Amino acid sequence: MSYDVRYLINKGYSGDFGIERSFNITAVELVKRKIIAIDSERISLVQGPPGTGKTTVFQQVINECLDETDENEVFLYVAPTNKLVADMLARVASIYRNQEKTLEDLKKEVRVYGSRFRYGGEFEHLRKPIDDDVKIVLSTEYQRIYESEAARRYHLLIDEASKSPIHRPFITISDRLLELIQQSEKEGILESLNVIGDPKQAIALGDEYRGREDLLLLTNLIRGLLSEKLKMEVDRGEIDITEAAFQELRGTFYEFLEVTRRLPHPSETPISVGFYGGNLRAYKKADEILKEVANQWDTNEARELSNLNDDYFKTVDILNSAITTGVPIIYVHVRGDYLRDYLFNERRAKVGLLFSCAIKKILKENVTIVAPYVDQQLQMKLRMHHLYGDVLGEDIKAINFTTIHRMLGAEDSHIIAILGKERTGRLYHERTIYFMEPEVFNVQLSRHKKLLVIVGDLFKLRREAKKMYEYLSGEEPRSFQESSLKLKVKQLEMTTEQILELANISSYNTLRRVPSVSSGDGCLFFRWE
C-alpha cells in the first residue's frame, strides 16, 4: 500500500486528530521537560497499553513545543512502518492548521521519508535534504536523513518501540553519528531521546530477539536506568521490568498511560491484572456501550437466524444474553486439540463463524475474526464463503479475517478471538504460541471496542501456564531470557484466571463440574457441546 502525501496533508488541514489532553497529561509533561531542557537527563520512556493513545503523546508534544525550541533543533519522529509515518503526517498537518500556519509553511518546515509515499510535483520538496528551515522530520526506521547545510540537533521521538532492537531506530541518523565519530566532535546531535512503546505487546520478534528483552530498545533503556538492586531483582525474575520502572522511574524517566479509550470496562481487567499490574483502567463502561448496541438489535434478523438450525439458535441466544445484561466478554468453551502438525481447529472455526454471522446480520456492525495461525485464518475464510455465503449475502465482504500478529495496532467493534494450542510442548522448540510469546494473548484480548468473543479452552491454558510456571520456579534461571519467561508465563496464568473469575467459574480446577452456562459481572460462559 502506498500513501498520497497530498491526501494526508489535506486530511490534516480539514480534520481534528486530537483527544482530550487530560488523559495523557503526565506523559506529555515528562517528554516536554526533556525537550525544553528543564531536566538535565534528556531521556523519557512512555509505556502505552492497548488503546491508550500512544502516538497522540508525540502529537501533543510537537504541538506544544514547536515554538519553544531554537532554530537548530529539529523534531525527528521515527516509526517502524510507513503507516505510522503517514498517520503522523496528517497529525502534523492538523497542528499546522490549528496554529494558523499555511501550506507553504508546512512545505518549508517538514520532511517525510519513507518507502511508500507518493509526493507528486506539488509536495516533492518534502523529500529533499534537511536545510535550515526544517523543524520536523518524519521517517521510518530504515531511511537515512541528509543535511544540506548546517548541522542540526535532534529531539528523537521513537514511536511504537515495543519490539524495536536497540540499534534500529538509530539507523536514521547513523551517517551523521559516524561523521561525528570520524571528526572526533564532542558536540552531540541528540538533544533528547524520547521513546514510546509497550513491551507487553512485543510480538512477532525474530528468533534472535524472542524472549530477549535486554536486546530491545525500550526495555534495555529501562534496565539501564534502574538501580542496581532492582536490576538484580529483574535479572533473577523476581520482578517484571516494567513493574520495576513503574516503582522506581515514574515521573523522572518513565510514564505509564493508564486509561484505555478502546476497551469497555470490565473487559480491560484481565490484561490489566495479568500484564499491567492492575494499573490499566477503562474510560468507557460496557453497560453503556452495549445499551447502544442493543438499540441496533434487528429482531426480525435474529428470529430468522434462530429458525435456521440449533447452532444458530444457541448463538443468537448467547449473543442476546450478553448484550442485554451489559457483559462485554463471551467465553465459548470449545475443546478439541489442534493436531501436532496441523494448525486448524474445525470445531472452533465453526463456532467463530456462527458468531461472526450473527453479529453482522443482527447488529449490522463490523466484526473481525482474529486467529492464532495463518492456516486457521485462511481455512475459516474459505469456509465462510462456502458454508455461510447464502446466509450473509453481500454482508460476507464486511467480515474481516486476520492473525494476531497482523492485528497488532488495529481494532474493531467486535472481535472473535480463536484460541491457539493451549498445551506447552515438551521441549523448547515444541513450545506453542502462547508459551513462546505470552504477549500474543494480551494482543488478542485487546482489539475490541464493544464485544469480545473468546473461542477455545481457557481451563487448559490456565492449567498449562500454572504447570510451566511451577517448573520454571523450581529451576535457577540461567539467563535473563529464562527469568523473563517465568514472569511472562505467570502473567498468562493470571490473565486467564481473571477471565474465568469474571464469569464466576475461576474456583473450578477442571471443567468437570462447571455448569453449562455461567455469567458474572464481565463475562458470559457457555459450554459448546
Task: Please report, for each region that a protein language model flagged, where it lies by residue.
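Short hydrophobic/aromatic beta-strand immediately N-terminal to the Walker A/P-loop
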Residues: 44-47, 76
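Hydrophobic positions on the alpha1 helix immediately C-terminal to the Walker A/P-loop
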Residues: 57-61
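Conserved helicase motor core of SF1/SF2 NTP-dependent helicases
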Residues: 72, 81-83, 143, 155, ...
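The conserved Walker
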Residues: 50
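Conserved glycine(s) of the Walker
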Residues: 53
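Conserved pre-motif I regulatory segment
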Residues: 12-45
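Conserved P-loop NTPase motor core of helicases/translocases
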Residues: 4-20, 63, 68-156, 160, ...
